């Protein structure tokens, strides 16, 4: 089974150009700009390219005083992000960082995270997004394996950085005390006063390197560069066509920015000149309060955060919400329905992976009509579903999912790669295209078990158990079984104050 939305979307320059223009107009990207500011935007892109450096500099030229990001401590404009990032870039250059190097960023969501990312981009260096959950040895392995030249970290990680980063140059992104030490971003910016260095173009565009453990448990760097202008426009417009983001909106960024989904929404914010409202740690009550305080139209989150938002008592005014965009893990069908019943039909669930990027989106209509679906394959994406011999399966049949687009990764920095069929890479899942044209993901290709001669996927049982009112969370795994060959075991977390028994749960899934 092949779904080729790349050919259908971009067949012919006129058709593709009209589609881009229509969506760009709808989201507000074609609003008039003063000629002098338009020239400044063009100069920024020519100097920095279509990188984080270029996009923030262009936004600063267009609307310097617009709010770019708000965290616990401060509100920072686009012009100030541009200025601070130039100061930090100069400090990194003094520490030996240059084009083609890699700088690790070990930080939680904050304005300093964005300043650091843009500063690294201004040097033409790669940004390596380190997981804030890393233990010291994991961090050390990644820094050595990815040939990192410097590290920027929140000072809460000072102990493991000092123990495992060796003699690497380092700067501190967020300092918990808030006293701006000299080797922190805040301290370096304060020492510079109102000035900012005039930096040369690096001549190369750095990459985003996102760490993924896949099925091995060992972090691997998935590198993604800047696609060419046409392919980049097609991919961006396809996503904007599926999820109704608006230019100049306000997004509460709850998802961690060091993961692909959080970084993706940060990038959307760059493109659309959105205000990003974020906090270093997720708290469901705070997220809903921020929607009311800022009149936010979007929340970017992961599914488990939706469950916690549903558990919040009280009712902040969330009437401005138009989008709750989710990715990062499977969305339980019952959770989708309950969330929309409370907050309205605002839920958009995106399916993809760190390596492949975006594959499909299930919007509110999809989730109401077919709650288990991963949605429609995005325009600009090609999907093949194949059997064990790499032959395309018939529509409706389950097979291994391969996908690709201009946003797919270049390969792992180690030189390894995913299993491929031509230009398409394996997602590691099995699924099918239904009669309704929607994609359905049945589970991981290595999760399926054969129990009593039947193919069974843990996700099916997880979805069923999520429908029990006493169940907060569940994980299902396969184990060896003398009678059936293999069987499934469910590990269940009950809600506080509930008392469902094993027999109750067994009866629920029958």
Name the predicted role of every residue range.
Residues 230-250, 258-298, 312:
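Conserved AMP-binding/adenylation subdomain of ANL enzymes
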Residues 1-76, 80-95, 503, 507:
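N-lobe entry segment of adenylate-forming
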Residues 376-380, 391-422, 454-456:
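Conserved ATP/PPi-binding loop(s) of AMP-dependent carboxylate-activating enzymes
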Residues 151, 289, 299, 405, ...:
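AMP-binding/adenylate-forming catalytic core of the ANL superfamily
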Residues 77-79, 207-234:
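Conserved AMP-binding A3 loop
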Residues 271, 297-300, 311-370, 382:
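Gly/Ser/Thr-rich phosphate-binding loop
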Residues 48, 74, 89-134, 455:
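Conserved AMP-binding/adenylate-forming
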Residues 82-87, 222-246, 307:
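Conserved structural elements of the adenylate-forming
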